[in-house]
């Protein structure tokens, strides 16, 4: 049999009151923080993704696809000129 690592068994941790006191606060807090991050629109700003109402402009109502890989830069310039 191999030696003990000196750590507490996982079953002892899960049945301890201290574990549940700490995690009953942190788990809901993480959920609320994530919900606020997305619902306030901060996630769009941090990651630079367009908001749902910015995918299509008034002039361009088609999907902005790059179709020619050799002229992709020119197509990107055309697609993003109104932004």
Swiss-Prot record:
Keywords: Chloroplast, Electron transport, Heme, Iron, Membrane, Metal-binding, Photosynthesis, Photosystem II, Plastid, Thylakoid, Transmembrane, Transmembrane helix, Transport. It is found in: Plastid, Chloroplast thylakoid membrane. Disulfide bonds: none annotated. GO terms for biological process: photosynthetic electron transport chain. One of its GO terms (molecular function) is heme binding. Belongs to the PsbE/PsbF family. This is Cytochrome b559 subunit alpha. This b-type cytochrome is tightly associated with the reaction center of photosystem II (PSII). PSII is a light-driven water:plastoquinone oxidoreductase that uses light energy to abstract electrons from H(2)O, generating O(2) and a proton gradient subsequently used for ATP formation. It consists of a core antenna complex that captures photons, and an electron transfer chain that converts photonic excitation into a charge separation. The keyword Electron transport applies. The lineage of its organism: Eukaryota, Viridiplantae, Chlorophyta, Nephroselmidophyceae, Nephroselmidales. With its partner (PsbF) binds heme. PSII binds additional chlorophylls, carotenoids and specific lipids. Heterodimer of an alpha subunit and a beta subunit. PSII is composed of 1 copy each of membrane proteins PsbA, PsbB, PsbC, PsbD, PsbE, PsbF, PsbH, PsbI, PsbJ, PsbK, PsbL, PsbM, PsbT, PsbX, PsbY, PsbZ, Psb30/Ycf12, at least 3 peripheral proteins of the oxygen-evolving complex and a large number of cofactors. It forms dimeric complexes. It comes from Nephroselmis olivacea. The keyword Electron transport applies. Pfam families: Cytochrom_B559, Cytochrom_B559a. Its cofactor is heme b.
């Amino acid at each position: 049999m191999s030696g003990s690592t000196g750590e507490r068994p996982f079953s002892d941790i899960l049945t301890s009151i201290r574990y549940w006191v700490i995690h009953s606060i942190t788990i809901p807090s993480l959920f609320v923080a994530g919900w606020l991050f997305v619902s306030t629109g901060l996630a769009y700003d941090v990651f630079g993704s367009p908001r749902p109402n910015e995918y299509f402009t008034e002039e361009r109502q088609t999907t902005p696809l790059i179709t020619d890989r050799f002229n992709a830069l020119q197509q990107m310039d055309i697609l993003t000129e109104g932004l």
